[in-house]
C-alpha cells in the first residue's frame, strides 16, 4: 500500500488486502526523522497532506504488528520507509541513519522487548546517501541490538543505473537484503525496461538484487504487465485491484500474497 502516512490508514490499506505498506519519512534540519508526510504534489487521486509525528506513527505501527495487540494485523509483514533525505546535506546521511535507528529501537522495536515484528526496508532516494545505512547499522550494534538488522533491508529508489546502485551497496558494505525499486508516480507512464534489467540481475548468478518491486501501479492492465515481467512486489494506491488480479487463473499458480513465514531477503527461485 502506497503512501500510508496516518495511523488510521494502516487499517484502511491492510483491510483492502495490503500485506505491506510504504510510509514517507521527512527529516528536520538536524537529520532527525520528524514526520510521516509526503506533501504536495503526490500521486493523482490521493490526499497528499496526511501526517503524524514519526515517533507517534511508529507507536501505531508497532501495535499493528505486535501479536496479541488489539490493533494487530497478522497480514502486515513488511514496511518500506521512503526516506525523504533530499532535504539533507550529503554529510548528514550518517546522522540520519543513527537517529532513525534510535527512533525505531525505542518506538517500534520497544528496545528489543516484544516490539513490532514487521520486516523493514530503508528506501533511500540518493546513492550519495549510502552512509545512512552505515549509521543505522553501527547504531544498532552500539545499542547492543545488532540482531535487529536481520529484520532490515535496503532499497535505492532513484531509478539509477543498476551498476551504479551496486557500487553504492559495495561502499555501504551491504551484501544482502536488497530490494530494488523501479517506478514513477501514477500520474505518468513508465515502461518496464529497467524492471526487466533488475529482474535479470536478480536471476543471474552474480547479481546483488534479492527482490524487485514496481510502483505505483493502480490499474489491472499495468499490474498484469508487471507480474508478467517477473516482479516480486507491486506498490499501489488500490490494494484491492492487485488482489483481484492475483486471483485470476493466469496468476494463481505462480503468485500469492507473501506471509510472515516467507523470507523477504531470499531470492525466489521457481
From Swiss-Prot:
EC number(s) given by UniProt: 4.6.1.-
Describe how the cofactor binds. Binds 1 Mg(2+) ion per subunit.
Show the GO MF annotations.
lyase activity; metal ion binding; phosphoric diester hydrolase activity; toxin activity
Tissue expression, as annotated, is: Expressed by the venom gland.
Q: Where do the annotations place Mg(2+) binding?
A: 22, 24, 82
Q: Does the keyword Transmembrane helix apply?
A: no
Disulfide linkages recorded for this protein, renumbered to the chain, are 42-48, 44-187
Pfam families per the UniProt record, alphabetical: GDPD_2
Keywords attached to this Swiss-Prot or TrEMBL record, sorted alphabetically, are: Cytolysis, Dermonecrotic toxin, Disulfide bond, Hemolysis, Lipid degradation, Lipid metabolism, Lyase, Magnesium, Metal-binding, Secreted, Toxin
Localization per Swiss-Prot or TrEMBL: Secreted
Give the catalysed reaction(s), semicolon-separated. Answer: an N-(acyl)-sphingosylphosphocholine = an N-(acyl)-sphingosyl-1,3-cyclic phosphate + choline; an N-(acyl)-sphingosylphosphoethanolamine = an N-(acyl)-sphingosyl-1,3-cyclic phosphate + ethanolamine; a 1-acyl-sn-glycero-3-phosphocholine = a 1-acyl-sn-glycero-2,3-cyclic phosphate + choline; a 1-acyl-sn-glycero-3-phosphoethanolamine = a 1-acyl-sn-glycero-2,3-cyclic phosphate + ethanolamine
Active site location:
2, 38
Q: Does the keyword Chaperone apply?
A: no
Domain of life (superkingdom): Eukaryota
Q: Which cofactor does it need?
A: Mg(2+)
Instruction: One GO cellular component term, please give it.
Output: extracellular region
GO BP term, pick one: killing of cells of another organism
The record, for InterPro entries, names: PLC-like_Pdiesterase_TIM-brl
Question: What's the stated role of this polypeptide?
Answer: Dermonecrotic toxins cleave the phosphodiester linkage between the phosphate and headgroup of certain phospholipids (sphingolipid and lysolipid substrates), forming an alcohol (often choline) and a cyclic phosphate. This toxin acts on sphingomyelin (SM). It may also act on ceramide phosphoethanolamine (CPE), lysophosphatidylcholine (LPC) and lysophosphatidylethanolamine (LPE), but not on lysophosphatidylserine (LPS), and lysophosphatidylglycerol (LPG). It acts by transphosphatidylation, releasing exclusively cyclic phosphate products as second products.
Q: Which family does it belong to?
A: Belongs to the arthropod phospholipase D family. Class II subfamily.
Q: What is this protein called?
A: Dermonecrotic toxin LsaSicTox-alphaIB1av
Amino acid at each position: 500500500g502506497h503512501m500510508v502516512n496516518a495511523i488510521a490508514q494502516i487499517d484502511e490499506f491492510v483491510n483492502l488486502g495490503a500485506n505491506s505498506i510504504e510510509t514517507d519519512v521527512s527529516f528536520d534540519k538536524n537529520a532527525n526523522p520528524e514526520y510521516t508526510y509526503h506533501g504536495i504534489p503526490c500521486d493523482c487521486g490521493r490526499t497528499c497532506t496526511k501526517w503524524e509525528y514519526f515517533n507517534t506513527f511508529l507507536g501505531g505501527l508497532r501495535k499493528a504488528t505486535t501479536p496479541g495487540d488489539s490493533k494487530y494485523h497478522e497480514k502486515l509483514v513488511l514496511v518500506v520507509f521512503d526516506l525523504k533525505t533530499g532535504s539533507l546535506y550529503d554529510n548528514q546521511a550518517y546522522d540520519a541513519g543513527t537517529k532513525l535507528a534510535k527512533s525505531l529501537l525505542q518506538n517500534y522495536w520497544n528496545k528489543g522487548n516484544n516490539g513490532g515484528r514487521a520486516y523493514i526496508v530503508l528506501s533511500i532516494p540518493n546513492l550519495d546517501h549510502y552512509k545512512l545505512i552505515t549509521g543505522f547499522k553501527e547504531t544498532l550494534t552500539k545499542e547492543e541490538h545488532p540482531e535487529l538488522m536481520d529484520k532490515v533491508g535496503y532499497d535505492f529508489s532513484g531509478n539509477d543505473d543498476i551498476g551504479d546502485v551496486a557500487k553504492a551497496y559495495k561502499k555501504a558494505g551491504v551484501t544482502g537484503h536488497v530490494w530494488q525499486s523501479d517506478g514513477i508516480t501514477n500520474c505518468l507512464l513508465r515502461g518496464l525496461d529497467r524492471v526487466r534489467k533488475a529482474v535479470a540481475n536478480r536471476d543471474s548468478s552474480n547479481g546483488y538484487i534479492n527482490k524487485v518491486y514496481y510502483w505505483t501501479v493502480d490499474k489491472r492492465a499495468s499490474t498484469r504487465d508487471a507480474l508478467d515481467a517477473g516482479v516480486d512486489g507491486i506498490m499501489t494506491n488500490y490494494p484491492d485491484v492487485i488482489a483481484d488480479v492475483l486471483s485470476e487463473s493466469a496468476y494463481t499458480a505462480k503468485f500469492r500474497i507473501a506471509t510472515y513465514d516467507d523470507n523477504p531477503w531470499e531470492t525466489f527461485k521457481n
